[in-house]
Amino acid sequence: DTYVSVTKAGYIKRTSPRSFAASTLEEIGKRDDYRLIFVQTAKTTQHLLMFTTLGNVIYRPIHELADIRWKDIGEHLSQTITNFETNEEIIYAEVVDQFDDATTYFAATRLGQIKRVERKEFSPWRTYKSKSVKYAKLKDKTDQIVAVAPIKLDDVLLISQNGYALRFNIEEVPVVGSKAAGVKAMNLKAVDALQAAFICNTSSFYLLTQRGSLKRVSIEEIPATSRAKRGLQVLRELKNKPHRVFLAGAVAEQGFVGDLFSTEVEENDQTLLVQSNKGTIYESRLQDLNLSERTSNGSFISDTI
């Protein structure tokens, strides 16, 4: 076995269990722009898939990853992937056994498109060592992927920057080829954008605004309808200093195990760390938040923020 790690900025490596055990998770070799988004044990016979914010997927067999100590910086994807852009980031990564199963992913974009695509589309391609391939088509340079994850026949919840929420079943979204564009996910206003998309497999979700206000809302407050609608308001509009959605996601139930930034939450102790623009870090345990009304603006995480 080996430990595979991927950072948001695109540093990847595998590390021996011995090196991993001799360090803490925080001691990973890193640069200032680092955020670890994936770490998992894997066998050298398995495969790593990495999905980027620009709609590209990168493939690596685990045995081809550079074997690097936990405390040292990994290999940057731009060293080998010739079409890796300077503004490109990894949004989701996973280790897989095979490509011929029925796994399907959903991908949602900032400008309000959504699609489903099958894993078999990413069966290792001839030029994988030097080129990524498309998994989603973006509308223009301002567009990017806000969420991608494997999905079964669940509902998805979309939340826009201006505070609209829309829920529908993923069956409304056709399964298409990796290079195809998606369908309209949400009817966004001209000045709005999709900020979050996640699977409705828990009873509540959280929402953090750019002003530092946080709340937890019951999923039942957003009844399932159909795609391409505007949705329901989950923030009250203020004339002065309006709240805008900064981050949103599902709040885990007891007995799940997983990752706060995953679109499908499976974790039993979910803590949100928020860093202000002054560098102060605030900590909130999401399950401890009282349920708020759908249109409330939540509570500030600190009196001084």
Roles of regions detected by a PLM:
Residues 1-305:
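Short, structured "edge-of-domain" segments at secondary-structure transitions
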